[in-house]
Amino acid sequence: MVALSNALSRVFGSVAGYKFPSFIQKGINALYAKIFKVDLSEFEPLENYKSLNALFTRSLKKERPFDKAPNICIAPCDALITECAFLDNDSALQIKGMPYKAHELVGEINPLSPSFFYVNFYLSPKDYHHYHAPCDLEILETRYFAGKLLPVNKPSLHKNKNLFVGNERVALVTKDIQGNRLYFVAVGALNVGKMRFNFDKNIQTNAKARFTQTYSYNPPIKVKKGDNLGNFEMGSTIVLFVQNTAFKDLKEKSVKFGESIGEFHAN
């Protein structure tokens, strides 16, 4: 199953990256936009994308404004928030009734503290696929975990136990403005050709190699709130684990990158 789902995603990625003649590509783009109800009001028009992958990975025409105050945490992406809560004995939910162990997702040996609040951001095929820093961060490590590429939509989350932990994923181990640990996890999914990270081009995802790899940074890589960290090549999921932060009532709400979603407490 692992080989099949990953092979299918590689094939889809190759097809999506193919540049058809312009009149054909325009029709493909228009069909995709119609099926998934893609809103291009902040983006270039459909005819400007030379491949389906170019449409998936489209960039904003203008920078979105966001609160620059250092104590404000912003949404890192355009997404639906499917679950959010404090960890309960190291347990988080991929969806209601489907728990998993947080330390396994991020690659720690010991359970995570109950002071961590987690937020699941589901990026659908219609969404802007880039992900950004939710606050000023120092990136200490990037951990790549090989795995399956199962869908991360709600039916699949209800059906497959430990889906996030079993799927291919990349966990950024970072330090926030207060010096607390913050985990930023990008979870792969079916038909997500690759996950890309702008701060380290060595990170390879959806490759044929089946191993875990750690990239350490000394000194740490410093990024500012709102910086573009990378992108999916179709919809998928971001999971944030944050400490000492008061979040708004977010569950089942759609958010946009740059929207204020929480506030850091003083340590």
Swiss-Prot record:
Names of required cofactors: pyruvate
PTM remark: Is synthesized initially as an inactive proenzyme. Formation of the active enzyme involves a self-maturation process in which the active site pyruvoyl group is generated from an internal serine residue via an autocatalytic post-translational modification. Two non-identical subunits are generated from the proenzyme in this reaction, and the pyruvate is formed at the N-terminus of the alpha chain, which is derived from the carboxyl end of the proenzyme.
Pathway(s) it belongs to: Phospholipid metabolism; phosphatidylethanolamine biosynthesis; phosphatidylethanolamine from CDP-diacylglycerol: step 2/2
Site (Cleavage (non-hydrolytic)): G235, S236
Sites of Pyruvic acid (Ser) modification: S236
E.C. designation(s): 4.1.1.65
Protein's UniProt keywords contain Nucleotide-binding: no
Active site residues of this protein: D78 (charge relay system), H132 (charge relay system), S236 (charge relay system), S236 (schiff-base intermediate with substrate)
Entry function: Catalyzes the formation of phosphatidylethanolamine (PtdEtn) from phosphatidylserine (PtdSer).
Entry similarity comment: Belongs to the phosphatidylserine decarboxylase family. PSD-B subfamily. Prokaryotic type I sub-subfamily.
Name of the protein this chain belongs to: Phosphatidylserine decarboxylase proenzyme
Source organism: Helicobacter pylori (strain P12)
Phylogenetic lineage: Bacteria, Pseudomonadati, Campylobacterota, Epsilonproteobacteria, Campylobacterales
Name of the gene: psd
